[in-house]
Amino acid sequence: MTMIRMRFLVGAIMLVALAAFPIFSQEEGEMSFFITSTGPGDGANLGGLDGADGHCAMLAQAAGGGGKTWHAYLSTTGAGGVNARDRIGSGPWYNAKGVQVAANVDELHYSNVGLTKETQLSEKGEMVNGRNDDPNQHDILTGSQLDGTRFTDGEDHTCGNWTSNGEGSAQVGHHDRTGGGAVASSWNAAHGSRNCGQT
C-alpha cells in the first residue's frame, strides 16, 4: 500500500485480511490471512470497517476462500474506537499456499517471524510487490500501533476511520519488512501516510 514519487498513500490501497473464527473451527492450512490484491479504488475511503470487511470478503470469495468471516486488519479511533487485534480472532492464520504465518495474536504482533514478503501473499497466492519492485506496494493500511491497538493521541491515524480520500493520514505497515519510517521493519506500524488519497 506506497509510491516513492509523491507518496500520497499507496500505489494501490492494500489491506491485510484475516479470517476470524473460534479456535479449532478451521482446517489446518486453509487460507485465513492475505493482503488484498486490489483496493476498492477510492483511496483510504473504504466505507468504514464494514466496507473494508466486505471488500476483503468479496476478494476471498472470488479466490475460493468463502465460508468464513473476514475482517480487515484495521483499527479505528475516537469514541467507540476498536483495536485491529480484537477483530481478528485467535489464530492460527495461514496464507493462500497453506503456510502458517502466525499461530496466535501474540505471535502475530510480537515475534512475527512468519510474516515476510514471501509469506504475506495475496488472496490469489501471489507475492505482493515490495519496496524494490515496480510499482512499490509495500505499504498496507492498518491504523494500528505495533501491538495491534488503536491510537489514543487524538491525531488522525485512520483517515477519518476509513471514510476519507483527501486530507488526513493513516498508519501503514510494510509487508516486506523494509523501508523508511519510524519502525521500518514493522508489518503493521511503520509510519503515517502523507494523506488519504490514492496515487
Q: Which residues make up each language-model segment?
A:
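Bacterial N-terminal signal peptides
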Residues: 10-20
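Intrinsically disordered, low-complexity regions of eukaryotic proteins
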Residues: 1-2, 108
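Bacterial N-terminal signal peptides that target proteins for export
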Residues: 2-10
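Secreted/extracellular ectodomain signature
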Residues: 23-199
